């Protein structure tokens, strides 16, 4: 019996860990490209050719097609076409550093489309056998301030370099000279935000499974060609770099950063784990929230099931079941009198003490002072069969110890239903925003096809409304209990 209990506990632990850390399906990939969306599906390419496709952003399966083989591709949509860059040889393969960076175009990423077909690849950079740079690990960047297209490449065997490409052809700009911008990293890419260019690179040892020390670091510059300095003022050309994400509890070797901007204040970062212990030590696709702290990118945490206080950022009040307040029958301290009586420890109010005072059927939701009472404690549980969205799955939000669940209702209202049916209005998308707070979005709202989020329309009144990152009404915090 003890052995059985131990095995059951281990299975539950591993299931929770998998839920927290990995995409579902068969997300096996190494060196994933930046995630692209095409005709309602998500795509990423990896080393060796091919890649993954997802219909919802959570369940990933093989199926993406990319000719040319090679290593560490990247992808970008420019106008109505997709530009894919990849490297041929390089990386110290065969004992040398000879390599080539190539680019090619496609009108679609869907291999089943009649429009699918890559153009002939064009060489945009190369390296010689004994050169101090490897032409490998391409990263594409379109400067939103100038419309100029750039490509970084290189590994920790030498310099990271940046070259300019023609956004119309994908070819190297004539006469452009490569600029050295970093050392001691690989799998680089540039992103832009609020006047800063950020160079993200993968530092550490690669390709050794659970023993890989891969981690993702960053520096920033006011110019696309550098210098890129970290938070301590160290230049990445001298080995600097501020940590963005490193190993997790059961996942190791974070590498090959990609950024996906879904909405204002909603950003995701993609990368691979070199080894996921809960997935047989395989290299897997990972997607995390991308946060920004003091103008530096930081990896957020994937949301996990548990018991939570759901606190409105608007005022700090807690989401609750709208029932009558039941006084906790604990003697009041006579603080004005001295006493030598022993100090007692009293329990919190329990569900059994109050549940019979609650009405049957549907009950409205409300926001009120946090008192750690049963009508304020929410058990949040993943619903795997409901699918997901980019980087996350849907959850049910229920009053702890009961069947009562939070639900979207007609006229963009929010209520608490008596039981969970699996209906779309009872499924919730919980996404961490770039400032660390969360938005809570029902999968569907009865009577409309518009997307709404849980909103504090007043200090004590929750409703559903359009998302506005600049309003604290739309933001929530989850405090684990």
PLM segments and residue spans:
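Bacterial N-terminal signal peptides that target proteins for export
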Residues: 1-9
């Amino acid at each position: 019996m003890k052995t059985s209990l131990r095995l059951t506990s281990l299975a539950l632990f591993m299931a929770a860990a998998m839920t927290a850390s990995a995409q579902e399906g068969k997300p096996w990939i190494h060196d994933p490209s930046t995630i692209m969306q095409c005709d309602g599906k998500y795509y990423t390419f990896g080393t060796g050719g091919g890649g993954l496709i997802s219909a919802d952003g959570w369940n990933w399966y093989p199926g993406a097609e990319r000719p040319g083989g090679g290593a560490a591709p990247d992808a970008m949509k420019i106008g109505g076409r997709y530009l894919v860059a990849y490297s041929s040889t390089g990386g110290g393969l065969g004992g040398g550093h000879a390599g080539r960076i190539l680019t090619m175009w496609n009108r679609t990423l869907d291999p089943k489309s009649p429009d699918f077909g890559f153009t002939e690849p064009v060489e945009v950079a190369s390296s010689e056998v004994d050169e101090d740079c490897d032409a490998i690990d391409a990263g594409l960047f379109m400067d939103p301030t100038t419309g100029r297209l750039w490509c970084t490449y290189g590994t920790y065997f030498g310099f990271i370099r940046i070259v300019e490409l023609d956004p119309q052809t994908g070819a190297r700009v004539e006469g452009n000279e490569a600029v050295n911008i970093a050392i001691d990293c690989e799998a680089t890419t540039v992103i832009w935000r609020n006047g800063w260019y950020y160079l993200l690179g993968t530092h550490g040892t690669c390709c050794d499974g659970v023993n890989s020390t891969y981690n993702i670091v960053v520096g920033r510059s006011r110019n696309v060609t550098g210098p890129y300095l970290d938070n301590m003022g160290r230049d990445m050309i001298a080995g600097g770099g501020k940590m963005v994400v490193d190993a997790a509890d059961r996942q190791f070797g974070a590498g090959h950063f990609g950024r996906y901007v879904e909405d204002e204040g909603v950003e995701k970062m993609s990368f691979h784990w070199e080894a996921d212990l809960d997935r047989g030590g395989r290299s897997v696709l990972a997607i995390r929230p991308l946060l920004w702290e003091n103008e530096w990118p930081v990896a957020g945490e994937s949301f996990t099931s548990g018991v939570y206080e759901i606190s409105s950022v608007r005022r700090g009040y807690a989401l609750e079941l709208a029932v009558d307040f039941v006084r906790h029958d604990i003697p009041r301290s006579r603080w004005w009198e001295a006493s030598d009586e022993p100090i007692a420890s009293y329990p919190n109010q329990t569900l059994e003490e109050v549940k019979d005072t609650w009405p049957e059927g549907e009950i409205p939701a409300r926001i009120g002072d946090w008192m750690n009472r049963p009508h304020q404690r929410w058990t949040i549980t993943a619903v795997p069969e409901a699918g997901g969205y980019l980087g996350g799955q849907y959850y049910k939000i229920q009053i702890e110890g009961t069947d009562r669940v939070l639900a979207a209702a007609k006229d963009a209202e929010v209520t608490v239903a008596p039981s969970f049916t699996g209906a779309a209005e009872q499924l919730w998308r919980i996404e961490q925003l770039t400032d660390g707070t969360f938005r809570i979005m029902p999968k569907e709202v009865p009577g409309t096809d518009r997307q709404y989020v849980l909103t504090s329309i007043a200090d004590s009144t929750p409703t559903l409304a359009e998302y506005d990152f600049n309003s604290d009404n739309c933001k929530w915090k989850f405090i684990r209990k």
